[in-house]
Amino acid sequence: MTTTRLLASLILGVALILSSGSNVSAYHSYVISVQKLKAALEKAPDHLHKGFFLIDVRSPKEHAGGIIPGTDRNIEFTQLKTRHIEIGAQPKDHIVVYCQSGHRSNIAAETLADLGYKHVYNVSGSMNAWEAAGYELQPATR
């Protein structure tokens, strides 16, 4: 490949990345199934010692309708950039986020990853999948 073609390919690649409108992040989030989340919650000795933070990123109104047992906090996904410190997590800690369908929690997971958290998990299907699996909900505490 000639130097000119190589340079043209490089410029085109950078232009495509910049025009895509997406941020390039050094971190990324992962996906976890409701079955794996349920198993992790059942293995935990108690709510406070489960080894990860479980965050509901739905609206307070949705949160009030019931939560996944073991949920630590409700922070609406649109507020995570300014309120993430309330989670109490360090960048190396594991954070699991869920919403109603998985869309908002996917955005939340990427937001947290962009903020430097290295182990962020989005619950696939979120509350819809949790309820479809027949798992119980817990009343919200606040």
Residue ranges and their predicted role:
Residues 98-99:
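Short, surface-exposed ligand- or partner-binding patches at beta-edge/loop junctions that are enriched
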